[in-house]
Amino acid sequence: MNKNIFCALVAAGVIVSAPVFANDDDVIDVQNTEVTVFGETRAFVEGGTATGKDPELKTSYSKLGVKYNNQFSPLTSVFGELSVDVDINGDGSDDITSRFGYVGVKSDLLGALSIGKTSSIMDSYVNKGAQFKASGNGSIQQTPFKLTNSVKYEKTTPIGVTFGAQSQMLDGATDETFDLWQIGATYQGVGVTYADDVINNISYYGIGASRSYGPISASGSFSVQDTTTTDIMGYEVVGGYTIKETTTILAGYGDTDATGDDGLITGGVHYKLGSDAVLFTEIDYDLDTEESVYSAGLGITF
């Protein structure tokens, strides 16, 4: 099935590649449907100071996909996405896996409703500490990034506030209609979300914020995982400074109140090569083990 999905994406890319890459907006009309091809290739070397940690070449976090939009009336359109994650690690196991696949209907008046495998609203509303390419972001307490068998609704008001609601509906033994649900809102870089994983008796809630002041950026999150036996609080903060619009220096810290977790310090430097490529070098320092993991590589997006 994964190979079939990949072949379909490759075929779509071949069909639209010439006009798409000739268009600055990367959009082409195919039988009155706007098709946008997007992706990212990220390759890096990862090593560390722990015993037995040898340098390793990785291509994780790469992706390829297409998005569709068809305006069938002046006020309403249908949209969708089909995408895969690609990890060309050479071991022949799970190199290509499904990322998202959904269809939906949207209008400026009523909002957007989609069904399928969608991205979690908690990740986009709260998880503001995900600023690094291959490091950090280990303290966030949230629902899974990818939600299969889900229904997702979002509506942006005239004043710019976006409200979101999402549920996961699985045919499981517990006979619950909504196996997981979450609601949230975001406005000008600040977001809040509450989620309830009914099947596993876990609730999540959190707040995240991201701000830029000229060359200075600041982002972070506070989140909680609440189970029947214990609560885990996590927080992350990341600061950045951009030099001449090409070089960004990042520093971050994340921690939870879980036993044995003293936190993680992360640093990195990102250097832009044009508008679509970034050279990066990053390092994680674990305050528990006093070991570090470093990475250096290149990411290209389109």
What residue ranges belong to the model's regions?
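Outer-membrane beta-barrel proteins
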Residues: 2-302
